[in-house]
Amino acid sequence: MIASLSGTVEHVALDRAVIAVGGLGVQFSATPQTLSTLHEGRPGAVQTHLVVKEDALTLYGFADRDEREVFEVLITANGVGPRLALAILSVHHPETVRRAVTEEDEKTLTRVPGIGPKMARKIIVELSGRLAPTGEPVPGAEAEASDEPAVETVWHADVVQAMAGLGWSEKEALKAVEATVAARPELDEGRDVAALLRATLRDVGMAGAVRGGR
């Protein structure tokens, strides 16, 4: 099993990266938050989990052991595959996932594309007692997302496409991107696709937390 990677970062995309290890370029999928810690041409390291199927070997990378641990517990739930588990961690911090399961917070889980009320309840029941909160502060926990739309620009399509790859419909993704840009116009001015993707996913998660508490 490949438990971790450490080497020179060769490439970073919106949903994957390549790290050179011993003369080989190893590609892995990861959340935008994890990818934001990697920079091309510089040393980088990730914790990993290898998914073996009959027709493919897929490697997933994580910023730390905690993120990987939550991923590995999530994929043991019936109906939660690696792609959905990665989508959950793209929207929510690992500690938020732990709290949602422990506190039976279905609304937080349903902010993730592909998870409806029934699936959220199923995840909570199956993982009960296996994802205890650590008490770690959740970055950006006090932020709130705006629902006001903004004007679409061509470069937003890259963000929409990346979110579609995580399971959102294009309509849902575009609405989320517009709301984030409306709340923080400076993201639109910077035209940093990765930064906008991370902010949008964070806002999607926080919107669920805010509404769930009402």
UniProtKB/Swiss-Prot annotation:
It is found in: Cytoplasm. It comes from the Bacteria. Keywords: Cytoplasm, DNA damage, DNA recombination, DNA repair, DNA-binding. Its main location: cytoplasm. GO terms for cellular component: cytoplasm; Holliday junction helicase complex; Holliday junction resolvase complex. Residues 143-151 are annotated as: Flexible linker. Residues 1-63 are annotated as: Domain I. GO terms for molecular function: ATP binding; four-way junction DNA binding; four-way junction helicase activity. Pfam families: HHH_5 (PF14520), RuvA_C (PF07499), RuvA_N (PF01330). InterPro entries: DNA_helicase_Holl-junc_RuvA_I, Hlx-hairpin-Hlx_DNA-bd_motif, NA-bd_OB-fold, RuvA, RuvA_2-like, RuvA_C, RuvA_C_sf. GO terms for biological process: DNA recombination; DNA repair. Residues 151-214 are annotated as: Domain III. Residues 64-142 are annotated as: Domain II. The RuvA-RuvB-RuvC complex processes Holliday junction (HJ) DNA during genetic recombination and DNA repair, while the RuvA-RuvB complex plays an important role in the rescue of blocked DNA replication forks via replication fork reversal (RFR). RuvA specifically binds to HJ cruciform DNA, conferring on it an open structure. The RuvB hexamer acts as an ATP-dependent pump, pulling dsDNA into and through the RuvAB complex. HJ branch migration allows RuvC to scan DNA until it finds its consensus sequence, where it cleaves and resolves the cruciform DNA. Has three domains with a flexible linker between the domains II and III and assumes an 'L' shape. Domain III is highly mobile and contacts RuvB. Homotetramer. Forms an RuvA(8)-RuvB(12)-Holliday junction (HJ) complex. HJ DNA is sandwiched between 2 RuvA tetramers; dsDNA enters through RuvA and exits via RuvB. An RuvB hexamer assembles on each DNA strand where it exits the tetramer. Each RuvB hexamer is contacted by two RuvA subunits (via domain III) on 2 adjacent RuvB subunits; this complex drives branch migration. In the full resolvosome a probable DNA-RuvA(4)-RuvB(12)-RuvC(2) complex forms which resolves the HJ. Belongs to the RuvA family. This is Holliday junction branch migration complex subunit RuvA. It comes from Micrococcus luteus (strain ATCC 4698 / DSM 20030 / JCM 1464 / CCM 169 / CCUG 5858 / IAM 1056 / NBRC 3333 / NCIMB 9278 / NCTC 2665 / VKM Ac-2230) (Micrococcus lysodeikticus). The lineage of its organism: Bacteria, Bacillati, Actinomycetota, Actinomycetes, Micrococcales.
